[in-house]
Amino acid sequence: GDLFDGGQTIAADAPISRCPLYVKEGSILTLGPDVQYANENKYDNIDIVVYPGKDASFLLYEDEGDNYNYEKGKYSTIPLKWNNKAKRLTIGKRSGSFDGMPLSRKFNVKIVGDDKVREIRYKGNQISVK
């Protein structure tokens, strides 16, 4: 939870059980479930972690994960935008589709510095989270 100015070298304790993570303010990180191989799990439950401090955007790209159908346009994207002043994350309308794409999914939205995790049921249309 410490804040550091950029452009410096930091010596940090990093035992094998704890790896330090440094993330630029105004970043959006998406995390899927732990899997052993790409198509083991349908990624219908995704964590979205917002590191506030500046406005941010991220394009969540998804495809079947096990073939080249993305070259034929079989993929989807979901835009994510963080408005730092309003403290609002907008999960935009999904574009595109692919075989086996989950039509509904759960996003667990965590804004760093706020202990609350917001569970959002997303069905492809724009939704805002504060």
List where the protein language model places each region.
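Intrinsically disordered, low-complexity linkers and stems that provide flexible hinges
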Residues: 116-130
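Catalytic core of carbohydrate-active enzymes
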Residues: 1-115, 124
